[in-house]
From Swiss-Prot:
It comes from Polynucleobacter asymbioticus (strain DSM 18221 / CIP 109841 / QLW-P1DMWA-1). This is Ribonuclease HII. Its main location: cytoplasm. It is found in: Cytoplasm. GO terms for cellular component: cytoplasm; ribonuclease H2 complex. Belongs to the RNase HII family. A divalent metal cation binds at residues 10-11, 106.
Length: 196
């Protein structure tokens, strides 16, 4: 008998100037609830890490997908976000061993999926599975930024996670761009054009 699995899907990293956009997909296990799921943006980094480990341990299945800076520059950030979400659902389905019945997507549009999907504005505050997906995406992306900081400490990625802050702008001005910067984003493009 096939179970009805509903997965939540959310992304992290649309706004940064560097790195991949990352999506998470999670099917929660009603027999193994996780307390305290909220939108990852409202949680401290320590709390997010704790909940991430709980999700890894207790969720029925989870998946991660991403779109690289090169893909973002090629197809634009919106399409890259949809691609990352689709990849996250595909990763979840591979781990689950079957496709979920439906995907609940945070936001106002859905990626092209081979299953039913529903967009829910502010879904990360309304649906626990979307909140869990938000946490998976955010922690995964933050870890990528910390690893990128090890390679390029001069940019301060571990502090601002690639977002367009004054410190990031100052580093761009001083050091130029690295290979992981999104060249289609205006501040990075201005550095490349010498007009920053």
């Amino acid at each position: 008998m096939n179970m009805i699995w509903v997965c939540g899907v959310d992304e992290a990293g649309r706004g940064p100037l560097v790195g991949a956009v990352v999506a998470g997909a999670v099917v929660l296990d009603p027999e193994n609830p996780i307390e305290g799921l909220k939108d990852s943006k409202k949680l401290s980094a320590v709390r997010r890490e704790f909940l991430y480990e709980q999700i890894m341990e207790k969720a029925k299945a989870w998946g991660v997908g991403e779109a690289s800076p090169t893909e973002i520059d090629s197809i634009n950030i919106l399409q890259a976000t949809m691609l990352a979400m689709r990849r996250a659902v595909e990763d979840l389905a591979a781990r689950l061993g079957e496709w979920p019945s439906k995907a609940l997507i945070d936001g106002n549009r859905c990626p092209e999926l081979s299953i039913a999907a529903e967009a829910i504005v502010k879904g990360d505050t309304k649906e626990p599975a979307i909140s869990a997906a938000s946490i998976v995406a955010k922690v995964t992306r933050d870890r990528q930024m910390i690893a990128l900081h090890e390679q390029h400490p001069q940019y301060g990625f571990s502090q601002h996670m690639g977002y367009p802050t004054e410190a990031h702008f100052a580093a761009l001005k001083q050091y130029g761009v690295c290979t992981e910067h999104r060249k289609s984003f205006a501040p990075v493009r201005r550095v490349l054009e010498g007009s920053f």
